[in-house]
Regions:
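N-terminal beta-alpha lobe that positions the nucleotide/phosphoryl donor
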Residues: 1-254
Length: 257
């Protein structure tokens, strides 16, 4: 059992982790930027460490500052929440070198599945159906434009390290592609510290239904059922509905197998 956990996040997810720590009699340490000193998560935690200025790249995304804070307070584990450093394999390896447990997947799994472009490639190699699009990462707008022209518009430009609707843009024609790509890339760099992109065929009026799998390091694995996340704003989920009204019992039985 951990004695002290540093929470490398902010907002609602940090508050939830703090509550879980309290229920388990584990000391919680919040980190905050200079702009978040009075935020709820900073007030609720047993300890709070300010790790830098307001921009995320200088605070929540600064791996050395986050890890330095954990070492300074004597935390034996770091919980990343979601977003920020939660799918950064380099950060996981840094934690391992400092003998601090990263609460989440191993660096090897994140390398394969944490990066969405790499995850697409892994699934394609395994024969799993995916939305038509690129198999490899796209680094330059001109390269992506040629791919999109061949694929046909509209296309969705996505950040490989993306999440929470960040770094996603729909492009409807070749003339707008370079500007749209660069806008999405800049947003991804600011949000995740990674401007690598990939491209998919844009699907209009889709249903977004997820099946979440949870496993521990001992090999115990469960699924948590389906969640319909189709109601979104700016590509970010607003409501998660379970069970989904859009999938039949027959389809569910096939997927659960």
């Amino acid at each position: 059992m951990f004695k002290k956990i540093l929470i490398a996040n902010r907002g609602e997810i940090a508050v939830r982790i703090i509550r879980a720590c309290r229920e388990m009699d584990i000391m919680s340490v919040a980190i905050c930027s200079e702009a978040d000193k009075d935020a709820l998560h900073a007030q609720l935690a047993d300890q709070t460490v300010c790790i830098g200025p307001a921009p995320a790249k200088d605070s929540y995304l600064d791996m050395e500052r986050v890890l330095g804070a954990a070492m300074a307070v004597g935390a034996d584990a770091i919980h990343p929440g979601f977003g920020f450093l939660s799918e950064n394999s380099k950060f996981v390896r840094m934690c391992e070198k400092c003998n601090i447990t990263f609460i989440g997947p191993s660096a090897e799994i994140i390398d394969r599945m944490g990066n969405k472009s790499a995850a697409r490639k892994t699934m394609m190699d395994a024969g799993v159906p995916v939305v038509p699009g690129t198999k490899d990462a796209v680094y330059e707008a001109e390269e992506g434009q040629k791919i999109a022209d061949d694929m046909g518009y509209p296309v969705m430009i996505k950040a490989s390290a993306g999440g929470g609707g960040k770094g996603m843009r729909v492009c409807y024609n070749s003339e707008d592609f370079v500007h749209t790509f660069e806008t999405a890339k800049l947003e991804a760099e600011n949000a995740f510290g990674d401007g690598t992109m990939y491209i998919e065929k844009y699907i209009e009026d889709p249903r977004h239904i997820e099946f979440q799998i949870l496993a521990d390091k001992y090999g115990n694995t469960i699924h948590l059922g389906e969640r319909d996340c189709s109601i979104q704003r700016r590509h970010q989920k607003l409501i998660e509905e379970s069970p989904s009204p859009a999938i039949s019992d027959e389809q569910l039985s096939l997927i659960h197998i």
